[in-house]
Structure formats: structure tokens, C-alpha cells
């Protein structure tokens, strides 16, 4: 098994950190890098996975409000790339887009959960300090721009998922109409 490094990529969110960092509160997005891929989580209004993948450290894929800040080595893992695909798929069931919450289930919570699975370590506390602060100031989430909750890279994943669902529905409707018009032949058996 490979001993793959686990990297936390941290991104500054917009210009606000110029003002809030002196207060000890930053607004950060994060993702976990492993096997040359970066996995992150963002919110959207649909009941499917909010987990998405970008090129490691590429803030342009996240959108204009993000700027790469730093990469932090968290540890290493012996999970294979195939194992990680399965882990991401399972986490996607828990981290659905419509379950995103700034205080309780955000990108940094996802990064911490994935890091704990892969190398047994949480992310540094300062990365998610805004979530704690938000519990003290509950209206804060409603003051944040929508694009902070749904990164641009996630928008393409959402579009693809919605397109796939539409195609599946069209295929199901087409096969339902075909099966009602086709008469079964007596005496024929189909092997499964």
C-alpha cells in the first residue's frame, strides 16, 4: 500500500479577511488533497452530494471570491485511490448540498471528517473559527454572499447531476412507454 500525503489546502475568502484577520477571525474554505486530487464540500439546494473535486490549490476553479492561502501537511494514508473514491462516495451521502450549514456542516467540517478518516487527524482549529463565531452571532450566515456557500467549481457538478437526473427520467419514461406497447412472447425466458 502507498503512503500518500494528506494535505489541507486553505483558501482565503474574498477581501473580508483583510479586515477580520486582525480580530482573529478569518473566512476560509478548505479541501483535502490526496493522490493529486482535491476534494471539498459546498452547499446547494438539492438533495444530492455537495462534495466536489478541483485541481489541488487552484482557487480559480472555486471562483473570484477565493484566493489560495496555504497548504498544510496533516499526515499520510495507506488507503488506495480506489478506497478513497469509495470513502468520498459515502461521505457524499452525509454531506449533501442541501445539508450545508455555515455553523454545523460546512467545507471545513467536511475537510476535518475526511482527514480523520484518512490519517486520524483533525484540521487546525483556526481554519473553522468562523463556524464557532457564527454560533455567537446567528444572523451572520444570512449576511454572507450566496457564492461563498456554493463555490463555482460545485456549480458545474450541480449542473451535471441535474442533467443526469433529467436523462434518467427521460429514459425511464421512454422505456415505460415501450414496455406497455410491446407484447411479451409466451414461452421465452430471459437470463439475468
Swiss-Prot record:
Entry annotation: catalytic residues: 29, 107
E.C. number(s) listed in UniProt: 3.4.19.12, 3.1.2.22
Extent of Acidic residues compositional bias: 162-171
Record bears the keyword Protease: yes
Presence of the UniProt keyword Hydrolase in the record: yes
Catalytic activities: Thiol-dependent hydrolysis of ester, thioester, amide, peptide and isopeptide bonds formed by the C-terminal Gly of ubiquitin (a 76-residue protein attached to proteins as an intracellular targeting signal); S-hexadecanoyl-L-cysteinyl-[protein] + H2O = L-cysteinyl-[protein] + hexadecanoate + H(+)
Any Gene Ontology biological process: proteolysis
UniProt entry keywords in alphabetical sequence: Cytoplasm, Hydrolase, Protease, Ubl conjugation pathway
Signal peptide positions (record): none
Region (Disordered): 160-192
Domain of life of the organism encoding this protein: Eukaryota
Database matches in InterPro entries: PPPDE_dom, PPPDE_sf
Chief location of this protein within or outside the cell: cytoplasm
Biased composition (Low complexity): 172-182
Location(s), subcellular: Cytoplasm
Listed name of the protein: Deubiquitinase DESI2
Protein's gene: desi2
